Amino acid sequence: MRTNELILYKDMEDGELLQDMTFLMENYNNEYYNEDDMKSLLYSTIGDLTELSVSHGFEGNLWHTYLTYLMVSHENAYSTSCEIVGPVEGSINIAALHDFKIFKELFDYDFQNLGEVLGEDGLAMIRDYKGVNGHGQVFNERIRDRICDLAKALDGTKCAEEFKEKVTQFYKEFGVGKLGLHKAFRIEHTEEGARIVPITKIAHVHLDDLVGYEMAKKKLIDNTEAFVMGRKSNNCLLFGDAGTGKSSSIKAILNQYYDQGLRMIEVYKHQFQDLNDVIAQIKNRNYKFIIYMDDLSFEEFEIEYKYLKAVIEGGLEKKPDNVLIYATSNRRHLIRETFKDKEDRDEELHTNDTVQEKLSLVARFGVTIYFGRPQKREFQEIVCQLAKRNNLNLTEEELLAEANKWELSHGGMSGRTAQQFIDYLAGKTGNFSEI
């Protein structure tokens, strides 16, 4: 089936299954091979295909979906050139069309003769597979559905050129590989360096879900929108009291601008040594990346802030235009200052240098946004709006009376406290006297 002639789409992850299946296609009727061994390989391959499909949540024609999955997952010179921007000019199209002709042949392969020789049972199953629970562990339903829809569209193509056009359109709309198919990522440190790993389950929070803080949200939106649109933008620090919606606002920003090419990588301060490696992996991709640091703060003895300052400020190499850093913190100045610091400054000749070194990290964030605790009237408004969204059948007087009792024993007034109160009410069936 000419898979050994692929130019761009080679050395694919999960490609062993393709090698086994094409070997069967080419040799199922070859007398040189033992028929029982060939049957064993066929059912082993069908088993591997089924396992992969269950883990990814695939349904329908598993062979078509598997081939589609290979194409949308493989990062090569053609696919990464087309992500977000669409069709490109140049000789790379010749190599791409060559490979898509081979994939088209694989799509159109008729398994009937192979099934008559080696057995039809397993092949019938993979032609119209029904999933167990409708979702997988690797992809969320949104990604799974896009891949399955593309597989169906490719099944209807009449030529390799049309086949290539549909795959390229997918690259433009949704991207390619893990950075294209997923919204959010975390970092794993390996012996080879930093590895970017997709986060498949993320909160589906949206900015409209966050009650209040309109000025703060607008400032965050304006900066992020400028970044996504390729205009000048700044690193952003969201600071203020706990439970006021800082982290939720960041997650909401990702959900709002994902379709415009925004991606987010969560990094913890013990991973700051990997930041340069991470940036090197993403700087040439056609996406906009926010490196997200939640609850960022440093004790007086911690020096990781120096790594962060160096990355933000940059050395000889300019920080890529497609990377920003967003952080949340309960501290305005990020680094805790103690009375000992003041005593040390009394003994140090260059007192101002010591102060500036510790405070200069905040200056690296061009946009700072304050999220303060709501006043009583604002807190009550948040409670009322959340109650309305959850269809709670209490009068406003009853609701606010219970909310006041709740906040006194649950950390004071904040958006988080209001949400926890509403979640508590929504979980009860009638009696609210035990709050």
Question: What is each stretch, according to the model?
Answer:
Residues 199-225:
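N-terminal pre-Walker A segment at the start of P-loop NTPase domains
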Residues 299-349, 353:
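Conserved catalytic/switch belt of AAA+ P-loop NTPases
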Residues 263-265, 276-320:
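Conserved nucleotide-sensing/catalytic segment adjacent to the nucleotide-binding pocket
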Residues 368, 372-435:
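C-terminal alpha-helical "lid" subdomain
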Residues 1-153:
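Intrinsically disordered, low-complexity N-terminal extensions of AAA+/P-loop NTPases
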Residues 235-265, 277-284:
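Walker A/P-loop
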Residues 133-196:
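Interdomain "pre-motor" coupling segment immediately N-terminal to P-loop NTPase/helicase cores
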